[in-house]
UniProtKB/Swiss-Prot annotation:
Residues 465-487 are annotated as: Disordered. SUPFAM superfamilies: Cyclin-like, Zinc beta-ribbon. This is Transcription factor IIIB 50 kDa subunit. Belongs to the TFIIB family. General activator of RNA polymerase III transcription. Factor exclusively required for RNA polymerase III transcription of genes with promoter elements upstream of the initiation sites. Contributes to the regulation of gene expression; functions as activator in the absence of oxidative stress. Down-regulates expression of target genes in response to oxidative stress. Overexpression protects cells against apoptosis in response to oxidative stress. Keywords: Activator, Metal-binding, Nucleus, Oxidation, Repeat, Transcription, Transcription regulation, Zinc, Zinc-finger. The modification Cysteine sulfenic acid (-SOH) is found at residue 462. Gene3D superfamilies: 2.20.25.10, Cyclin-like. GO terms for molecular function: RNA polymerase III type 3 promoter sequence-specific DNA binding; TBP-class protein binding; zinc ion binding. It comes from Xenopus tropicalis (Western clawed frog). Zn(2+) binds at residues 7, 10, 28, 31. CDD domains: CYCLIN_BRF2.
Length: 519
C-alpha cells in the first residue's frame, strides 16, 4: 500500500495489510483503525478449486459430547458452586471426572455410582487443596451411602494414581465451628450463649487433640467428636450460665444437625477429663463429676502433656505389679505342690516310724500290766499250782510270744491305719487351707492386674469396649437336630470309603440304581 495514504483518525501514515482469517484488511498500525475490508466472499474461480470439509477435520478436534458426560460435568460444576469452592477447583474436578469417564472400569455402572464418581472427583480436589470438607458432606449432596462412596473413592484414587493427602484436623475443626450460629454475631442468639468464634475454635482444637492422644478419634467419624468438643469448650468458657444447656439444645440453638454418636463421644470425653483430673493436686481433693469437670477444662488442657505422661507412668507401674503378682502366684502354686508332696512323703515315713516305736512300747507296757494282773487274780483263786505247772512247761513263754506277735501286729496295724488316716487328713486340711488362702491372694492380685483400673489407662475403643459378636450354634437342639435323613452327595460318600471292598459295593449299588429305571 502506498505511503501517501494516512489514517483518518490519528493521521498516521503507518498503514499495513492484515489477513484476518480469510479476509484481507488495511489497518492503521498505530491506532488499529480499519481503513478497508477485503472481500467477504470468494470468486467463482476460487470456489471451483474448493471442496467440502467436516468441521471436526477443519478444527482438529471433535466437540461432540455424549449426553451422560455433559450431564456429569454440569453436575460437578453445580456441586462446586453449592460448596462455594474457588473457580480453579471446578476445573480440576472436571478434569478428574473426564479421566474417570474414559476408564473402562466405569463404563457400565449404575446411576448411583455415576453420582458417586462425580462426588469423589470433587472430594479429591478438596483434599488436594487442603479444603476442609468431610466425606459425609459430599454423601449428603449426592445422596450416596458412605460405605459405597468410600469404596469407589479408593478405587478412583488407585485407578487414576492420584496423591490424596490426609485431612487437616485443625482446618476441619475451624470449618465446622464456622457453621455454628452461636459463634456468630447474631441478634437471635441470647447474650449469655453467644461466644466469639476464635476463642471457641482454639479451645475446641485443643480438646480434639486431647481426644486424639487418648484414642478417642481412632476409627471414628470426625464430625460427632468435633461437635462434642465444641459443646464442652463452649460450656467451659461460661460454666455458670451454660452447664444447664443440653447437647441437643446447643445444636438446636446453633442451627446444626446433631449426629447420633455425639452423645457417646461426649460421655467418653467427660470420662477422659475425669481420669486426668486425678493427677492435678488442686483437683484431686475435689469430687468431680461429668458436669463439674467442665469448669476445669482450661487447667486440664494447659497441663495435658504432663497429665498424659503421668497417666502412662502409672499404667506401666500397674502393669509391672501385675506381672510380679502373676509370677509370685505361679511360684506359690508350684512351691506349695512340691512342699505338700514332700510333706506327705516325709510325714508318713516319720509317722510310721514313730508309731511303730511308740505302739510297741505302749503295747508291751499294757500287756505286761494286764498279764501281771491276770496272773495275780488266778493265783488268788487258787490256780497258782496250775500256773506254775504251765509256766514250768513253757506255756507262759509261748503265750507271751503269741500275744506279743499277734496282738502287737494287730494293734500296730490298727493304730497305724487310724493314726495315719487322721494325720493325713489333718495335714491335707491344713495344707489345703493354706494353699487356698495363698492362691486366693494370688488370684486377687492377678484379677486386679489383668484388668488395670480404668482410672489409670487409656485404650482404643475396640479394646476398651469390644463388640459382642453373635456366635451361631450349628445344632442348637443337640441330637434332636440330627434325624439321619439328611441329604448326602456322592462325593461325600466317596470321602468315607476306605477299602476296595467298600468301593466295589458302592459301584454295584450305583449300577443297580441305574438298572431299575430301565427295567
Amino acid at each position: 500500500m502506498s505511503g501517501a495514504k494516512q489514517c483518518p483518525d490519528c493521521g498516521s501514515s503507518d498503514i499495513v495489510e492484515d489477513a484476518h482469517y480469510s479476509q484481507d484488511q488495511v489497518v492503521c498500525a498505530d491506532c488499529g483503525c480499519i481503513l478497508s475490508e477485503g472481500l467477504i466472499t470468494t470468486t467463482a474461480a476460487e470456489e471451483s478449486h474448493l471442496q467440502a470439509v467436516r468441521f471436526a477435520d477443519s478444527t482438529g478436534e471433535n466437540d461432540s459430547m455424549t449426553v451422560s458426560k455433559l450431564r456429569g460435568i454440569v453436575r460437578v460444576r453445580n456441586i462446586c458452586r453449592v460448596l462455594r469452592l474457588p473457580d480453579g477447583f471446578s476445573d480440576t474436578a472436571v478434569s478428574y471426572y473426564e479421566q474417570a469417564y474414559k476408564h473402562p472400569l466405569y463404563h457400565s455402572v449404575s446411576i448411583e455410582k455415576k453420582e458417586i464418581i462425580v462426588g469423589c472427583c470433587v472430594y479429591i480436589t478438596c483434599r488436594q487443596h487442603q479444603w476442609p470438607i468431610t466425606m459425609a458432606t459430599i454423601c449428603s449432596l449426592v445422596y450416596a451411602k458412605k460405605e459405597l462412596f468410600a469404596s469407589i473413592f479408593l478405587s478412583i484414587v488407585q485407578v487414576l494414581k492420584l496423591d490424596v493427602p490426609s485431612v487437616s484436623l485443625q482446618n476441619l475443626v475451624m470449618s465446622h465451628c464456622r457453621s455454628f450460629k452461636l459463634f456468630k454475631d447474631s441478634c437471635e442468639v441470647p447474650s449469655h450463649y453467644a461466644e466469639k468464634l476464635d476463642t471457641v475454635s482454639e479451645r475446641t482444637v485443643q480438646t480434639v487433640e486431647l481426644a486424639y492422644e487418648t484414642w478417642l478419634v481412632t476409627g471414628r467419624h470426625p464430625i460427632p467428636i468435633i461437635t462434642a468438643a465444641a459443646y464442652i469448650s463452649w460450656q467451659s468458657l461460661l460454666p455458670a450460665r451454660r452447664l444447664s444447656c443440653s447437647l441437643s439444645r446447643f445444636c438446636k440453638l446453633s442451627d446444626v444437625d446433631l449426629p447420633p454418636p455425639s452423645a457417646i463421644r461426649l460421655r467418653e470425653l467427660q470420662g477422659t477429663l475425669i481420669k486426668l483430673s486425678v493427677y492435678l493436686p488442686w483437683l484431686k481433693v475435689l469430687s468431680l463429676n461429668k458436669k463439674t469437670v467442665v469448669q476445669h477444662l482450661g487447667d486440664l488442657l494447659r497441663h495435658r502433656v504432663f497429665l498424659l505422661r503421668k497417666a502412662l507412668a502409672v499404667t506401666e507401674a500397674e502393669l509391672s505389679r501385675g506381672t510380679l503378682a502373676d509370677t509370685e502366684a505361679q511360684l506359690s502354686r508350684g512351691t506349695l505342690a512340691d512342699t505338700e508332696a514332700q510333706l506327705s512323703r516325709g510325714t508318713l515315713a516319720d509317722t510310721e516310724a514313730q508309731l511303730s516305736r511308740g505302739t510297741l512300747a505302749d503295747t508291751e507296757a499294757q500287756l505286761s500290766r494286764g498279764t501281771l494282773a491276770d496272773t495275780e487274780a488266778q493265783l488268788s483263786r487258787g490256780t497258782l499250782a496250775d500256773t506254775e505247772a504251765q509256766l514250768s512247761r513253757g506255756t507262759l513263754a509261748d503265750t507271751e510270744a503269741q500275744l506279743s506277735r499277734g496282738t502287737l501286729a494287730d494293734t500296730e496295724a490298727q493304730l497305724s491305719r487310724g493314726t495315719l488316716a487322721d494325720t493325713v487328713a489333718q495335714l491335707s486340711r491344713g495344707t489345703l487351707a493354706d494353699t487356698e488362702a495363698q492362691l486366693s491372694r494370688g488370684t486377687k492380685a492377678l484379677s486386679s492386674n489383668d484388668q488395670p483400673n480404668s482410672t489409670f489407662v487409656f485404650l482404643p475403643p475396640c479394646v476398651s469396649n469390644p463388640r459382642k459378636r453373635s456366635r451361631s450354634i450349628p445344632f442348637p437342639r443337640g441330637h434332636l437336630d440330627i434325624t439321619g435323613d439328611e441329604d448326602i452327595s456322592d462325593s461325600e460318600i466317596e470321602q468315607y470309603l476306605r477299602t476296595p471292598a467298600e468301593m466295589k459295593e458302592f459301584e454295584q449299588a450305583l449300577n443297580r440304581d441305574d438298572e431299575l429305571p430301565n427295567a
